[in-house]
Protein backbone atom coordinates (compact mmCIF):
# COMPACT_ATOMS: atom_id res chain seq x y z
CA UNK A 1 0.00 0.00 0.00
CA UNK A 2 2.92 2.29 0.81
CA UNK A 3 4.46 1.58 -2.58
CA UNK A 4 1.17 2.28 -4.26
CA UNK A 5 0.95 5.62 -2.53
CA UNK A 6 4.58 6.43 -3.42
CA UNK A 7 3.94 5.65 -7.07
CA UNK A 8 0.51 7.20 -7.61
CA UNK A 9 0.52 9.73 -4.83
CA UNK A 10 -1.52 9.93 -1.70
CA UNK A 11 -5.27 10.29 -2.40
CA UNK A 12 -6.65 13.73 -1.51
CA UNK A 13 -9.29 14.09 1.13
CA UNK A 14 -12.17 16.34 0.21
CA UNK A 15 -11.78 19.65 1.94
CA UNK A 16 -14.86 20.13 4.01
CA UNK A 17 -14.55 23.92 3.58
CA UNK A 18 -14.52 23.67 -0.24
CA UNK A 19 -18.17 22.80 -0.44
CA UNK A 20 -19.00 25.54 1.99
CA UNK A 21 -16.91 28.03 -0.03
CA UNK A 22 -18.69 27.28 -3.31
CA UNK A 23 -22.05 27.21 -1.57
CA UNK A 24 -21.43 30.72 -0.21
CA UNK A 25 -20.54 32.10 -3.67
CA UNK A 26 -23.62 30.45 -5.18
CA UNK A 27 -25.83 32.01 -2.55
CA UNK A 28 -24.20 35.40 -3.16
CA UNK A 29 -24.72 35.18 -6.93
CA UNK A 30 -28.32 34.08 -6.44
CA UNK A 31 -28.88 36.97 -4.07
CA UNK A 32 -27.38 39.46 -6.53
CA UNK A 33 -29.54 38.07 -9.31
CA UNK A 34 -32.62 38.56 -7.15
CA UNK A 35 -31.58 42.15 -6.38
CA UNK A 36 -31.09 42.91 -10.08
CA UNK A 37 -34.40 41.23 -10.84
CA UNK A 38 -36.23 43.40 -8.29
CA UNK A 39 -34.52 46.52 -9.67
CA UNK A 40 -35.56 45.58 -13.20
CA UNK A 41 -39.14 44.94 -12.08
CA UNK A 42 -39.23 48.27 -10.22
CA UNK A 43 -37.95 50.10 -13.31
CA UNK A 44 -40.50 48.33 -15.49
CA UNK A 45 -43.33 49.25 -13.11
CA UNK A 46 -42.15 52.88 -13.08
CA UNK A 47 -41.95 52.92 -16.88
CA UNK A 48 -45.43 51.43 -17.21
CA UNK A 49 -46.84 53.96 -14.77
CA UNK A 50 -45.19 56.82 -16.68
CA UNK A 51 -46.52 55.44 -19.94
CA UNK A 52 -50.03 55.12 -18.51
CA UNK A 53 -49.95 58.67 -17.14
CA UNK A 54 -48.77 60.09 -20.46
CA UNK A 55 -51.39 58.02 -22.27
CA UNK A 56 -54.05 59.34 -19.91
CA UNK A 57 -52.95 62.92 -20.59
CA UNK A 58 -52.94 62.26 -24.34
CA UNK A 59 -56.50 60.93 -24.16
CA UNK A 60 -57.56 63.89 -22.02
CA UNK A 61 -55.85 66.23 -24.48
CA UNK A 62 -57.72 64.69 -27.40
CA UNK A 63 -61.01 64.86 -25.52
CA UNK A 64 -60.36 68.50 -24.62
CA UNK A 65 -59.52 69.31 -28.23
CA UNK A 66 -62.80 67.83 -29.38
CA UNK A 67 -64.78 69.45 -26.56
CA UNK A 68 -63.32 72.92 -27.19
CA UNK A 69 -63.86 72.62 -30.93
CA UNK A 70 -67.46 71.51 -30.47
CA UNK A 71 -68.10 74.32 -27.97
CA UNK A 72 -66.75 76.91 -30.41
CA UNK A 73 -68.79 75.49 -33.27
CA UNK A 74 -71.92 75.36 -31.15
CA UNK A 75 -71.50 79.02 -30.21
CA UNK A 76 -70.38 80.45 -33.56
CA UNK A 77 -71.61 78.10 -36.29
CA UNK A 78 -74.20 80.55 -37.61
CA UNK A 79 -71.76 83.48 -37.48
CA UNK A 80 -68.93 81.90 -39.45
CA UNK A 81 -70.35 82.54 -42.95
CA UNK A 82 -71.12 86.22 -42.39
CA UNK A 83 -67.73 86.81 -40.77
CA UNK A 84 -65.90 84.73 -43.39
CA UNK A 85 -64.38 82.84 -40.47
CA UNK A 86 -63.29 79.25 -39.97
CA UNK A 87 -62.51 77.03 -36.96
CA UNK A 88 -59.71 74.48 -37.41
CA UNK A 89 -60.34 71.41 -35.25
CA UNK A 90 -56.70 70.26 -35.27
CA UNK A 91 -55.17 73.56 -34.13
CA UNK A 92 -58.22 75.11 -32.42
CA UNK A 93 -57.64 78.23 -34.49
CA UNK A 94 -60.52 80.64 -35.00
CA UNK A 95 -59.54 82.28 -38.28
CA UNK A 96 -60.82 85.52 -39.80
CA UNK A 97 -60.09 85.38 -43.52
CA UNK A 98 -61.35 88.61 -45.15
CA UNK A 99 -58.30 90.90 -45.44
CA UNK A 100 -60.34 93.81 -46.80
CA UNK A 101 -62.53 93.68 -43.70
CA UNK A 102 -59.66 93.39 -41.22
CA UNK A 103 -57.19 96.14 -42.14
CA UNK A 104 -56.33 98.58 -44.88
CA UNK A 105 -53.25 97.67 -46.91
CA UNK A 106 -50.07 98.20 -44.89
CA UNK A 107 -52.02 99.58 -41.89
CA UNK A 108 -52.28 98.33 -38.31
CA UNK A 109 -55.53 100.14 -37.46
CA UNK A 110 -58.57 97.87 -37.25
CA UNK A 111 -61.27 98.71 -39.74
CA UNK A 112 -64.77 99.58 -38.44
CA UNK A 113 -66.28 96.39 -39.82
CA UNK A 114 -63.76 94.24 -37.98
CA UNK A 115 -64.32 96.27 -34.81
CA UNK A 116 -68.00 95.36 -34.96
CA UNK A 117 -67.10 91.71 -35.40
CA UNK A 118 -64.75 91.81 -32.41
CA UNK A 119 -67.44 93.53 -30.33
CA UNK A 120 -69.65 90.54 -30.90
CA UNK A 121 -67.04 87.81 -31.05
CA UNK A 122 -64.57 88.39 -28.23
CA UNK A 123 -66.86 88.41 -25.15
CA UNK A 124 -68.62 85.27 -26.38
CA UNK A 125 -65.26 83.66 -27.17
CA UNK A 126 -64.10 84.20 -23.58
CA UNK A 127 -67.37 82.91 -22.20
CA UNK A 128 -67.15 79.77 -24.34
CA UNK A 129 -63.62 79.01 -23.16
CA UNK A 130 -64.29 79.79 -19.51
CA UNK A 131 -65.05 76.18 -18.51
CA UNK A 132 -61.79 74.99 -20.13
CA UNK A 133 -59.48 77.41 -18.30
CA UNK A 134 -57.76 74.64 -16.34
CA UNK A 135 -56.63 72.90 -19.54
CA UNK A 136 -55.54 76.02 -21.47
CA UNK A 137 -51.88 77.03 -21.50
CA UNK A 138 -52.10 80.02 -23.83
CA UNK A 139 -54.34 81.76 -26.34
CA UNK A 140 -52.53 83.44 -29.20
CA UNK A 141 -53.76 86.23 -31.39
CA UNK A 142 -51.79 85.41 -34.53
CA UNK A 143 -51.19 87.77 -37.43
CA UNK A 144 -50.30 86.49 -40.89
CA UNK A 145 -49.44 88.35 -44.09
CA UNK A 146 -48.71 87.53 -47.70
CA UNK A 147 -45.12 87.66 -48.95
CA UNK A 148 -45.76 90.92 -50.81
CA UNK A 149 -44.35 94.26 -49.74
CA UNK A 150 -44.38 97.19 -52.12
CA UNK A 151 -40.96 98.83 -52.29
CA UNK A 152 -39.11 95.97 -50.59
CA UNK A 153 -35.45 95.63 -51.59
CA UNK A 154 -35.64 91.82 -51.60
CA UNK A 155 -37.48 88.88 -50.04
CA UNK A 156 -35.69 89.33 -46.71
CA UNK A 157 -36.63 93.00 -46.54
CA UNK A 158 -40.24 92.12 -47.37
CA UNK A 159 -40.28 89.43 -44.68
CA UNK A 160 -39.18 91.76 -41.90
CA UNK A 161 -41.45 94.58 -43.04
CA UNK A 162 -44.35 92.14 -42.92
CA UNK A 163 -43.14 90.91 -39.52
CA UNK A 164 -43.44 94.41 -38.10
CA UNK A 165 -46.85 94.80 -39.76
CA UNK A 166 -48.23 91.49 -38.48
CA UNK A 167 -47.01 92.17 -34.95
CA UNK A 168 -48.57 95.62 -34.98
CA UNK A 169 -51.87 94.23 -36.19
CA UNK A 170 -52.09 91.53 -33.54
CA UNK A 171 -51.32 94.07 -30.83
CA UNK A 172 -54.09 96.29 -32.20
CA UNK A 173 -56.55 93.38 -32.16
CA UNK A 174 -55.63 92.30 -28.64
CA UNK A 175 -55.69 95.84 -27.26
CA UNK A 176 -59.06 96.59 -28.85
CA UNK A 177 -60.50 93.33 -27.54
CA UNK A 178 -59.05 93.92 -24.08
CA UNK A 179 -60.62 97.40 -23.88
CA UNK A 180 -64.14 96.19 -24.64
CA UNK A 181 -66.54 97.03 -21.78
CA UNK A 182 -67.92 93.48 -21.73
CA UNK A 183 -64.44 92.12 -20.99
CA UNK A 184 -63.74 94.11 -17.82
CA UNK A 185 -64.25 91.12 -15.51
CA UNK A 186 -61.93 88.93 -17.59
CA UNK A 187 -59.06 91.35 -18.11
CA UNK A 188 -56.74 89.65 -15.59
CA UNK A 189 -57.26 86.34 -17.35
CA UNK A 190 -56.64 87.97 -20.73
CA UNK A 191 -53.38 89.52 -19.49
CA UNK A 192 -52.23 86.20 -18.06
CA UNK A 193 -53.05 83.90 -20.96
CA UNK A 194 -53.29 85.92 -24.17
CA UNK A 195 -50.33 86.75 -26.38
CA UNK A 196 -50.04 88.72 -29.62
CA UNK A 197 -47.79 87.00 -32.18
CA UNK A 198 -46.91 88.16 -35.68
CA UNK A 199 -45.76 85.48 -38.12
CA UNK A 200 -45.17 87.70 -41.16
CA UNK A 201 -45.30 85.53 -44.31
CA UNK A 202 -43.86 82.40 -42.68
CA UNK A 203 -47.19 80.54 -42.90
CA UNK A 204 -48.69 81.53 -46.21
CA UNK A 205 -51.72 79.74 -47.66
CA UNK A 206 -51.19 77.94 -50.97
CA UNK A 207 -53.59 77.37 -53.84
CA UNK A 208 -54.18 73.89 -55.20
CA UNK A 209 -51.51 74.47 -57.85
CA UNK A 210 -48.92 75.38 -55.22
CA UNK A 211 -48.95 79.14 -55.79
CA UNK A 212 -49.40 81.54 -52.90
CA UNK A 213 -52.97 82.59 -52.18
CA UNK A 214 -52.23 86.18 -51.22
CA UNK A 215 -55.72 87.03 -50.00
CA UNK A 216 -56.06 83.94 -47.80
CA UNK A 217 -52.54 84.44 -46.46
CA UNK A 218 -53.63 87.78 -44.96
CA UNK A 219 -55.54 86.69 -41.89
CA UNK A 220 -55.92 86.94 -38.11
CA UNK A 221 -56.47 83.91 -35.90
CA UNK A 222 -57.29 83.27 -32.25
CA UNK A 223 -55.60 79.99 -31.35
CA UNK A 224 -56.09 77.93 -28.18
CA UNK A 225 -53.04 76.01 -26.96
CA UNK A 226 -53.79 73.40 -24.31
CA UNK A 227 -51.41 72.48 -21.49
CA UNK A 228 -51.11 68.76 -22.31
CA UNK A 229 -47.50 69.15 -23.46
CA UNK A 230 -46.64 71.04 -20.27
CA UNK A 231 -48.14 68.26 -18.14
CA UNK A 232 -46.18 65.58 -20.01
CA UNK A 233 -42.94 67.53 -19.52
CA UNK A 234 -43.75 67.81 -15.81
CA UNK A 235 -44.20 64.03 -15.53
CA UNK A 236 -40.85 63.41 -17.23
CA UNK A 237 -39.14 66.00 -15.01
CA UNK A 238 -40.63 64.51 -11.83
CA UNK A 239 -39.41 61.06 -12.85
CA UNK A 240 -35.89 62.41 -13.47
CA UNK A 241 -35.84 63.98 -10.00
CA UNK A 242 -37.07 60.75 -8.39
CA UNK A 243 -34.47 58.62 -10.17
Residue locations for each model-derived region?
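Short edge beta-strands and adjacent turn/loop segments
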Residues: 82-95, 137
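Periplasmic OmpA-like peptidoglycan-binding domain that tethers envelope proteins to the cell wall
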Residues: 112, 144-233
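Short, solvent-exposed beta-strand/turn patches at coil↔beta or beta↔helix junctions
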Residues: 90-119, 148-161
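Extracytoplasmic/periplasmic, Sec-exported soluble proteins
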Residues: 57-64, 106-117, 133, 161-169, ...
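Short terminal targeting/anchoring segments
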Residues: 1-83
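Short, cationic low-complexity segments
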Residues: 236-243
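Extracytoplasmic beta-rich ectodomain segments of secreted or membrane-anchored proteins
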Residues: 72-76, 94-96, 107-138
Amino acid sequence: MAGFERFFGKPRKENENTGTHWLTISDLMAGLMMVFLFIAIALMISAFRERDRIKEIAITYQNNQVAIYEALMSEFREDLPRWDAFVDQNTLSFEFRSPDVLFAGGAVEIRPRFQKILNEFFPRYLETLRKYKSSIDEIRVEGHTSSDWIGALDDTDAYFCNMELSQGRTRSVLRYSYDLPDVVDDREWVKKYFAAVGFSSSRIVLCDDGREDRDRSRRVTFRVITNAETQIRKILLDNEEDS
